[in-house]
């Protein structure tokens, strides 16, 4: 499940960048198609993340539970910011504050996911 979650995140970030570039170039129709595919990836990301969070709750108990829940909330925050940035770009609205939130959420997710929680790089 961990590999599926990381793969879906990687594909999600790639599709996010492609959609951003297309919106900036003014290719609205292809950008909307990529955006819809990205929304399907969001569903996969949320489902696999929920399963991983449930595994943490069941298997590791209280010492790690707080960090697992913060990572889950930061992951949801990151998905929400990706969606809001793309929607703002499509409508031509400023997205500076959303980019700041995206950066903070991304750092939280990477640090907690890869370096603090079990199943990350430090626990292999």
Curated annotation (Swiss-Prot):
Compartment list: Cell membrane
| Keywords carried by this UniProt record | Cell membrane, Membrane, Transmembrane, Transmembrane helix
How does the record say this protein sits in the membrane? Multi-pass membrane protein
Q: Which domain of life is it from?
A: Bacteria
List where the protein spans the membrane.
3-23, 33-53, 62-82, 104-124
GO (cellular component) term, any one: plasma membrane
**Into which family does the record put it?**
Belongs to the UPF0344 family.
Q: This protein is called what?
A: UPF0344 protein OB1184
């Amino acid at each position: 499940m961990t590999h599926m979650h990381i793969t879906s995140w990687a594909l999600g970030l790639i599709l996010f960048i492609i959609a951003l570039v297309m919106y900036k170039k003014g290719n609205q129709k292809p950008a909307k198609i990529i955006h819809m595919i990205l929304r399907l990836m969001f569903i996969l990301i949320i489902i696999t993340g929920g399963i991983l969070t449930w595994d943490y709750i069941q298997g590791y108990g209280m010492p790690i539970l707080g960090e697992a829940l913060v990572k889950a909330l930061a992951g949801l925050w990151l998905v929400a910011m990706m969606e809001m940035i793309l929607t703002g770009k499509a409508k031509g609205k400023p997205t500076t504050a959303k980019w700041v939130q995206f950066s903070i959420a991304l750092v939280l997710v990477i640090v907690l996911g890869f370096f603090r929680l079990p199943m990350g790089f430090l626990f292999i």
